[in-house]
Design a protein with these regions (language model features):
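Residues that define the transmembrane beta-barrel architecture of outer-membrane proteins
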Residues: 43, 65-69, 103-107, 142-148, ...
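Transmembrane beta-strands of outer-membrane beta-barrel pores
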Residues: 51-57, 87-91, 115, 129-133, ...
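Surface-exposed loop and membrane-interface regions of Gram-negative outer-membrane beta-barrel proteins
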Residues: 61, 81-142, 209, 215, ...
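Structural signature of outer-membrane beta-barrel channels/translocons
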Residues: 74-80, 114-116, 151-157, 185-187, ...
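Repeated loop/turn-to-beta-strand initiation elements of outer-membrane beta-barrel proteins
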Residues: 79-85, 119-125, 156-161, 190-196, ...
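Outer-membrane beta-barrel "beta-signal"
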Residues: 223, 227-233, 254-269
Length: 269
């Protein structure tokens, strides 16, 4: 009897152990502490405003080397789509003598799509409308211009092709003119960036039987530096030059594509 009792006790102990282990293995794990889930913003809005010693566009001064006040806003979605607007004072249309009054403003509107393949490679496609409000002389081709563009970037280097689907900056019969922009913004330090650029403007079509490109095609280049300060402030300066011909780019007695320097201060927010 004692032998049987010991055996039974051992058997019951084994069963209890197995049951306890089984319950431990099948019991649900304690729920992890819930992590705070931040909602994804449907879009972001950023802005910028700057004061420049002059406005240079594709190697050409747009303000006859006088100061320019510039600013804009951009809206971007998490999916890569974006839209924005930007403006600056100008003087080149008055200098060209093609307006009665007005035309002292360039107002741009644009939208497109950006995609990042990885941390190094990306692309950008979109449309850009240049608008120059004003009262123009009769028979003048208005400078309002629409361009489609596509760009690719690798780290700090970008290559952008812009194709005009309208007349280009007031030149008659200039549809399909284009501009190619190769730029590199190399970070020297966490706050200093070296800015370089070379571009090529090609005009298509004819005016009064002469090819537009004969006097209007040119190459431009730029080199400069930018300092990123605290609070979204940027300070910089750059040197620009071009091969713009006197016959095509002399306004108010001066070639607007000659070598010049520009300084600026900009605030982003």
């Amino acid at each position: 009897m004692k032998l049987h009792s010991a055996t039974c006790i051992a058997t019951l102990a084994a069963i209890a152990t197995i049951t306890s282990n089984a319950q431990a293995q099948t019991a649900p794990a304690p729920a992890p502490a819930s992590a705070e889930v931040k909602p994804v913003e449907p879009y972001t809005i950023t802005g910028n405003f700057g004061i420049y010693s002059q406005y240079i566009f594709r190697g050409l001064t747009q303000t006859d080397r006088k100061p320019a006040f510039q600013g804009g806003f951009d809206l971007a979605t998490p999916g890569g789509f974006y839209a924005g607007t930007w403006g600056s004072n100008i003087s080149w249309l008055h200098d060209a003598g093609v307006v009665d009054h007005g035309a002292s403003l360039e107002w741009d509107f644009y939208g497109g799509y950006k995609y990042a393949f990885n941390d190094d490679w990306g692309m950008d496609v979109g449309v850009l409308q240049y608008w120059y409000p004003g009262d123009y002389l009769e028979g003048v081709t208005k400078p309002n211009t629409t361009e489609l563009y596509i760009a690719g970037n690798w780290k700090w280097v970008s290559l952008k092709y812009s194709h005009a689907v309208s007349n280009t900056f007031g030149i008659p019969d200039s549809h399909n003119s284009w501009y190619l922009d190769l730029s590199a913004n190399y970070p020297l330090t966490e706050t200093w960036t070296l800015n370089t650029h070379v571009g090529r403007q090609e005009y298509k079509g004819q005016t009064n039987g002469f090819n537009n490109g004969d006097n209007l095609n040119y190459t431009d280049w730029k080199v400069g530096v930018t300092y990123a300060a605290a609070g979204g402030w940027n300070f910089g300066a750059y040197y620009t030059d071009s091969t713009a011909k006197d016959a095509g780019y002399t306004l108010a007695g001066r070639n607007i594509g000659k070598a010049t320097g520009t300084a600026f201060v900009q605030k982003t927010f």
